[in-house]
Amino acid sequence: MKMPVIEKIEQLHDEMVGWRRDLHAHPELGFTESRTSTFIQERLQSFAVDEIQTFTGTGVVGVIHGRDGDAAIGLRADIDALPIAEESGVPYASTKAGVMHACGHDGHTAMLLGAAKYLAATRNFKGTVYLIFQPAEEIGGARQVVADGLFDRFPMLRVFGMHNFPSMPVGEFHWRNGPIMAAANFFEIRITGRGAHGAQPHYGIDPIVAGSSLVSALQSIVSRTIDPYQAAVVTIGSFQAGMAANAIPAEAVLKGTARWLDERVGETIQQSIRRIAKCVSESYGASAEVEMHMVAPTTINDEAAMSLARNAATAVAGAAGVVEMVQPVMGGEDFAYMLGVKQGAYIMLGAKRSDSVNPMLHHPSFDFNDAILSTGAAYWTKLVEQQLAV
C-alpha cells in the first residue's frame, strides 16, 4: 500500500512532466537562466508559497512556513544547462542551438517544484522550508551563492541536494557517508613556441610536438605520483593548435580536468601539472603557462544528515531501494560549497532506462527519465515532514 504523500505526489506527475519538458526545450547556461528563473517564480507564486526571493542574479528561493516552529531546512535543485548540441531527437528538444539540458537539471527543477506545490498545499510540518533553485552548477556557481550570503539571508539547520544518475537502477536511492563526489578542477596549458613553414621546421619551435609529449607525460601523475589506494583522475579533453597543414603554429592550447577526493592528493596533482608542463615545454625550447580553475571541492556528506536523508528515501523506496555506495563518484558537484559551511547530505536517484538506449550524463542524446519525477518529489516532501515533524 502506498503512503498518502506518495499518492498525492503521483497526482502531480503529468504536471511535473510538462514543466520538465518546457524547461528542457528552453535551456540556459549558468548565470543566464533568466527565462528559467521567471518560470520558477511564476510557478511558486501560483502555489501560494509565503515568499519568493532572488539571489545571485538568476537564483530563486521559495519560502514555505509550516505550523509553529523555528527549525528550518533547505532543499536545493540546480537549474542551468550545458553548452552541448542536442541529439536526443525528442519532440521537446532544445530550441537553442548548442545548448541543452544534458545533466537533468530540468528534471531536478521540476521535482523540487512538485514538492513545493505539495508542501504549500498541505503544510504538514513545523518550521520553515527553503526551496533553493541554484544557478550555474556546471561552472561552480554555488561558490558565489555562498559568498553572496545565501545562508545568512535564509538561516537553516541543514541543506540537502539530489542528482539523477542514469547508470543506477531507476527509482533506487544511492547514498554514502563522507566523500560522495570528487573535487573538480579545470586547467588550461598554453604552450608558446615559434611559428615556421612546415617544410622548414628547424626555423621554428613546434608547440604541437611539445604538447603531444606533454599529454603523455601528464598521464604519469596518477600512475607514478599518487598512492594507488587514492582515487585520482587527470584527463586532457582538448588540444588546439594551428589552422594550416603546411605551417607550424606559434602556440598550442591544452585543456583538461583533474579530480580527487583527498585534498593532499589534489595539491600534489596541481603541483605536478605545473611542473611537468614547464619542464616538458622547455625541453623542446618552448614555454608554458598554466591556469587552473577550481569548480568544486570534494562533496562530503555529514553522517547525521545522511541518516535523515536515508530515512526519507526508505519511506519512499523501501529498504531494498536504498543502497549504500561502495565507491564515490569521480564527477564533481558544486553543492560541496554548501556542505562546506552547512550540515547536509547529497543523495543519488537512479534513472536508468529499461530500453537499450540509456545515454549517460553530458551526452548529446541524454534526456532526463520522467519516470523518477514523482519519486524525487516524494523524497523531498518526506525529508521535510520527517525532520520538521508536527
Give residue ranges: language-model regions:
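Histidine/acidic-residue-rich, glycine-tolerant segments that coordinate divalent metal ions
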Residues: V61, L82-I84, S88-M100, D106-G107, ...
